[in-house]
Amino acid sequence: MFAAAATKGDVTVLNVIPKHLDATISKLVDIGCEVEEFDDAVRVVAKNRLRSTQVKTLPYPGYPTDMQPQIGVVLALAQGTSTITESIFENRFKYLDELARMGAVIKVEGNSATIEGVEKFSGARVSAPDLRAGAALCIAGLATDGITIVD
């Protein structure tokens, strides 16, 4: 879903329970994605540059901390200034240093990150500190015109 948002794509995810994704879907709609929910699928379409927003991770049914890096990538490409507040885990922002190597403009203070959206990323060699960060950096790589290598 976030790959579609980052690349201005059109993706349908099958075999999901859309109700379980309410917080994630709500944020995708908030930033400007078109989202269609089906019985066991979700379609995400992003045609234009997306908008900034505020995200705060919370226990289910709130916004999932596991999806925080993925929306961070999308917000780094969105128009305007976004804020992510991580209220579940410490040190969940390690991927942002790597995203900055690709051209993202980010300031981290404690458990909050302020992200100023840029038009596009530049390809770079980046290192994923964990699985979630690796997924996010792969999405960032899809959104570049250059070559991105994720170690």
Predicted regions and their residues:
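Short, structured segments at the rim of ligand-binding sites
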Residues: 1-151
